[in-house]
Amino acid sequence: MKLTTVLVVALLVLAACQFTVTDNSGDDPENPSLRSVGENQNPDSTKTITAWATRDMTNMRRGLNRPSKRCLAGSARCEFHKPSSCCSGHCIFWWCA
């Protein structure tokens, strides 16, 4: 019972941390210095990656198995709050599924 409680609390803490990172991701146009140094400074980059992932998922549903090279393949590192950068559209514990 104690182990289950500890696991549930740990899961809730991790989920809260992810939501905090997502909310403070630095997309504030008034203060671009909040963004991390390695992050792309183009504000449209997320929309573009989302469009690529959507197009690739549509192509896969239609049987056109030609995923774009612009998305991350399976077992690649990804950002938890941007799963659309993965070709599969799923980012699990910072790895594309």
UniProtKB/Swiss-Prot annotation:
In alphabetical order, the GO MF annotations are:
ion channel regulator activity; toxin activity
List GO terms (cellular component aspect).
Answer: extracellular region
| Tissue spec | Expressed by the venom duct.
Disulphide bond pairs = 71-87, 78-91, 86-96
Residue stretch(es) of the prosequence = 23-68
Q: Which residues form the signal peptide?
A: 1-22
What are the start and end residues of every segment in region (Disordered)?
A: 23-46
List keywords of the entry alphabetically: Cleavage on pair of basic residues, Disulfide bond, Ion channel impairing toxin, Knottin, Neurotoxin, Secreted, Signal, Toxin
The cellular location(s) given in this protein's UniProt record come to: Secreted
Sequence similarity: Belongs to the conotoxin O1 superfamily.
Q: What does this protein do?
A: Probable neurotoxin with unknown target. Possibly targets ion channels.
| Domain remarks | The presence of a 'disulfide through disulfide knot' structurally defines this protein as a knottin. The cysteine framework is VI/VII (C-C-CC-C-C).
Question: What is the recorded name of this protein?
Answer: Conotoxin Cal6.1a
Print the organism lineage.
Eukaryota, Metazoa, Spiralia, Lophotrochozoa, Mollusca
